């Protein structure tokens, strides 16, 4: 534009438009930076909560273990027998297929979500579930998992059910999205809820996709697989010995 010429309307609007675009871009960038900083602070705070809960659970587990030892020693000193509380949790593994299976046990296996051989699920022991386990006892192995078994299963083989999809538990956010309303926001919360059979056990166990285990190291042995555990076979209740089987299949 020549010197001394009065600027036209278009000459004025062009730089104003550019300034507005720059201002909008600056505002968007500032908003993104603020949101990122807020998210980082929130995540740091959540990490503190998760760490604190994990510490609390460790303390709780250790105190429970020490109490068991104390009660056993006390019973021994008094010349009596220590009778532990009835187990509330079992881990159930399907070990046989559908060949020659009657409709009723087949339906129960579906109800327990044991759709395939080597599928495993956590089950709360009630009068009703005990009856279901009795019906399908010739097709399953089950028992009382310890804390180590629960933790190893969830960390190594754990998948969540999200929108009917099998999703790896690679991020605590997946757990929080599904179970946060029950106060379960991380892996250790999930493990604690399962192991202690907490108030949200049903929701937690249903969130976990049935575990897909391997054949036990060394195999089942054809004859052993079709006999009850107390007869030297593989089916039925093996109580605490389920932990050795979990280790062999995990």
Swiss-Prot record:
The keyword Transmembrane does not apply. One of its GO terms (molecular function) is RNA binding. Belongs to the universal ribosomal protein uL30 family. The gene is RPL7. This is Large ribosomal subunit protein uL30. One of its GO terms (biological process) is maturation of LSU-rRNA from tricistronic rRNA transcript (SSU-rRNA, 5.8S rRNA, LSU-rRNA). The keyword Ribonucleoprotein applies. Pfam families: Ribosomal_L30, Ribosomal_L30_N. PANTHER family: 60S RIBOSOMAL PROTEIN L7, LARGE RIBOSOMAL SUBUNIT PROTEIN UL30. Keywords: Ribonucleoprotein, Ribosomal protein. Gene3D superfamilies: Ribosomal protein L30, ferredoxin-like fold domain. InterPro entries: Ribo_uL30_ferredoxin-like_sf (IPR036919), Ribosomal_uL30 (IPR039699), Ribosomal_uL30_CS (IPR018038), Ribosomal_uL30_euk (IPR005998), Ribosomal_uL30_euk_arc (IPR035808), Ribosomal_uL30_ferredoxin-like (IPR016082), Ribosomal_uL30_N_euk (IPR012988). SUPFAM superfamilies: Ribosomal protein L30p/L7e. One of its GO terms (cellular component) is cytosolic large ribosomal subunit.
């Amino acid at each position: 534009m020549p010197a001394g010429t009065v600027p036209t309307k278009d000459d004025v609007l062009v730089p104003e438009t550019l300034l507005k675009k720059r201002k909008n871009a600056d505002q968007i960038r500032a908003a993104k930076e603020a949101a990122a900083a807020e998210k980082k602070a929130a995540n740091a705070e959540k990490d503190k909560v998760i760490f604190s809960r994990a510490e609390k659970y460790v303390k709780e587990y250790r105190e429970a273990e020490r109490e068991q030892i104390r009660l056993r020693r006390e019973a021994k000193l008094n010349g009596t027998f220590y009778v532990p509380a009835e187990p509330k949790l079992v881990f159930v593994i399907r070990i046989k297929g559908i060949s020659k299976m009657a409709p009723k046990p087949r339906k129960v296996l579906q109800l327990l979500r044991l759709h395939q051989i080597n599928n495993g699920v956590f089950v709360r022991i009630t009068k009703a579930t005990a009856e279901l386990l009795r019906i399908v006892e010739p097709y399953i192995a089950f028992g009382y998992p310890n804390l180590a078994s629960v933790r190893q299963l969830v960390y190594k083989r754990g998948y969540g059910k999200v929108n009917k999809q099998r999703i790896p538990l690679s991020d605590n956010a997946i757990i929080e999205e599904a179970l946060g309303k029950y106060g379960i926001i991380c892996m250790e919360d999930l493990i604690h809820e399962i192991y202690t059979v907490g108030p949200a056990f049903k929701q937690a166990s249903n969130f976990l996709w049935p575990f897909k285990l391997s054949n036990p190291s060394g195999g089942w042995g054809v004859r052993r697989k079709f006999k009850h555990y107390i007869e030297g076979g593989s089916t039925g209740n093996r109580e605490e010995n389920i932990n050795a089987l979990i280790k062999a299949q995990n």
